[in-house]
């Protein structure tokens, strides 16, 4: 993605649940769907005016077959896979080891872009909670500061 912001989401019981966000200079894709050429269950929605560089599977395969580009494209693919794996591991670990409030506090430290650019209801679902729960957590955190 050259510019903009997107969210990844799933539809569960008729409700869309945000699972991830991507911003400038990040790879945007259902990577599994791209590699396996199968339909994805993940929706990707642009939330701002977004500019993308589109690479089709066929073009990707042609670059891999090119003696000049193959090693660079293989490295690119490895880096993308590593990025996805690290993000996935961090996300799973946060749901296993942290409370919703701890996940929000972590987001305050490391996810400023998400907090500044995304609507609260998407952030709530990203944290695995309802918008009402997020509001309560934010109030608890801000109360000591206000008093």
Place the predicted regions along the sequence by residue.
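Glycine- and acidic-residue-biased ligand/ion/polar-headgroup-sensing regions
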Residues: 1-7, 24-25
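Short beta-strand segments in beta-sandwich/barrel cores
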Residues: 5-9, 51-52
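Cyclic-nucleotide recognition modules
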Residues: 18-78
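Hydrophobic/aromatic residues within well-ordered alpha-helical segments
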Residues: 73, 77-80, 84, 100
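Short, Lys/Arg-enriched N-terminal segment that forms or immediately precedes the first helix
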Residues: 84-93
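Phosphate-/nucleic-acid-contacting segments
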Residues: 98-147
């Amino acid at each position: 993605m050259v510019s903009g912001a997107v969210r990844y989401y799933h539809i569960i019981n008729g409700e869309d649940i945000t699972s991830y966000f991507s911003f400038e200079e990040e790879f945007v894709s259902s990577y599994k769907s791209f590699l396996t050429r199968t339909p994805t269950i993940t929706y990707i929605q642009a939330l701002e005016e977004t500019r993308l560089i589109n690479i089709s599977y066929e073009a990707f395969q042609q670059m891999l077959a090119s003696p000049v580009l193959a090693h660079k494209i293989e490295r690119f693919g490895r880096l993308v896979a590593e990025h996805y794996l690290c993000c996935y591991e961090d996300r799973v670990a946060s749901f296993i080891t942290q409370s919703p409030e701890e996940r929000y506090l972590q987001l305050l430290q490391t996810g400023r872009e998400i907090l500044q650019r995304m609507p609260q209801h998407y952030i709530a679902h990203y944290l695995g909670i309802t918008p009402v729960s997020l509001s309560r957590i934010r109030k608890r955190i801000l109360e000591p500061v206000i008093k």
